[in-house]
Structure formats: structure tokens, C-alpha cells
From Swiss-Prot:
Family membership: Belongs to the peptidase S14 family.
InterPro entries per record: ClpP, ClpP/crotonase-like_dom_sf, ClpP/TepA, ClpP_His_AS, ClpP_Ser_AS
Species assigned in the record: Pseudomonas putida (strain W619)
Source species taxonomy: Bacteria, Pseudomonadati, Pseudomonadota, Gammaproteobacteria, Pseudomonadales
Protein name: ATP-dependent Clp protease proteolytic subunit
GO molecular function terms noted in the UniProt entry: ATP-dependent peptidase activity; ATPase binding; serine-type endopeptidase activity
Length: 213
């Protein structure tokens, strides 16, 4: 694929009120300008920042599929700084992480709460990390519905089904038993980076990057 195929995120970030730095690459054919996120995508770095919702999830999924097509044997690095969000949007990212061939390494920068914490834990074993002052929070899914009594009952059962499934997956990825997960997600459960490592949500706390000599 050509370099023009790299997904551009700058317009979305600018719409949110931010300025996106540009980087200039020199080559035999001259100079080429990239927004910083497109340049990092070339290094197989994806950012999951802000609330997890359908549009953002679609961008993350598209980038993972693109990087798999580029090189199915090289790790993808997913940087997470998210308060959580939609379960269905988050599960589309989760399922893609499990589906594609490359390992997805997850790194928490800032916070990984709710669905953000779930996706952090869903990274490849041995490749899930937090920076030292990151915060992680797990809890049960939230939801609300208005309507007829029967419809409310249907939606209440659905959110209980989702809760049970998320607990099962969290138990699988952390190594905790299901009863522990049920108890610990009953209310907002905040953890430091070191506590998240002890719990099994991540594998290690990054302090300094290990550079190749």
C-alpha cells in the first residue's frame, strides 16, 4: 500500500480544539510532511484517547487491520488514555485485537478506566504495561433505559448478560477467579499502576524505555 493509505487523524483532533504537530521527513525524492499521528502509525503505534465510542472504535479497528495487512508478524502498540465508554464500541476493538495475527501490546498513559481498563488487560500476555503514575479503574457496566415495563425488563436482562460476559473475560485475562472479579467490580475500583500489575490487569510498570544498544 502507498503511504497515502495511512489513516489521517489530524482533522478530528483539530475539530476537538487541538493543534497537531507536523513532522518533516527527508528522502532522496525530497521532503514529505506528516501529522504526528500518521508518522507514529508508520511505527505501528495507535492511540486510543478519550471516551470509547463508535467512531473512535472504528478508527482504531481500521488502523489495526491496516497494520496487520502491512506486516502480520510485527507487534502493534496500542496507547490507552481513556475514561471508558460504550461497551459495544469497546467490544469491537477487543474482538479485533483477538482476531488479528499480530500481538497487540497495550500501554496505559494517564488513565484506563472501565472499558479502557478492559482493553488494557486484553493486550497480548507479557506485553501489557502502565506508565508509573497511570490510574486504572474497573467496575460493572453502566446503563439506563426508558420505555414500557416489558422493554425495561428486557434491557435490564441484557445489561446483566453483558456484565456476566465482561466478568468472564476479565477473569480470563487477569487470572483472577470469577468470584473475585464479581466482587471487585461491584463498585468503582481504582488501582495504581503497581496494584494493576499485582492484580493481573497488566504485566509490568514501565519506568524507562529500554533502548537497543
Amino acid at each position: 500500500m502507498s503511504r497515502n493509505s495511512y489513516i489521517q487523524q489530524s482533522s478530528d483532533i483539530q475539530a476537538a480544539g487541538g493543534l497537531v504537530p507536523m513532522v518533516i521527513e527527508q528522502s532522496a525524492r525530497g521532503e514529505r510532511a506528516y501529522d504526528i499521528y500518521s508518522r507514529l502509525l508508520k511505527e505501528r503505534v495507535i492511540f486510543l484517547v478519550g471516551p470509547v465510542e463508535d467512531y473512535m472504535a472504528n478508527l482504531v479497528v481500521a488502523q489495526m487491520l491496516f497494520l496487520e495487512a502491512e506486516n502480520p508478524d510485527k507487534d502493534i502498540h496500542l496507547y490507552i488514555n481513556s475514561p471508558g465508554g460504550s461497551v459495544t464500541a469497546g467490544m469491537s476493538i477487543y474482538d479485533t485485537m483477538q482476531f488479528i495475527k499480530p500481538d497487540v501490546s497495550t500501554i496505559c498513559i494517564g488513565q484506563a478506566c472501565s472499558m479502557g481498563a478492559f482493553l488494557l488487560a486484553a493486550g497480548a500476555k507479557g506485553k501489557r504495561h502502565c506508565l508509573p503514575n497511570s490510574r486504572v479503574m474497573i467496575h460493572q457496566p453502566l446503563g439506563g433505559f426508558q420505555g414500557q415495563a416489558t422493554d425495561i425488563e428486557i434491557h435490564a436482562q441484557e445489561i446483566l448478560n453483558i456484565k456476566a460476559r465482561l466478568n468472564e473475560l476479565l477473569a480470563y485475562h487477569t487470572g483472577q477467579d470469577l468470584e473475585t472479579i464479581k466482587r471487585d467490580t461491584e463498585r468503582d475500583n481504582f488501582m495504581s499502576a503497581s496494584r494493576a500489575a499485582e492484580y493481573g490487569l497488566i504485566d509490568s510498570v514501565y519506568d524507562k524505555r529500554q533502548l537497543a544498544s
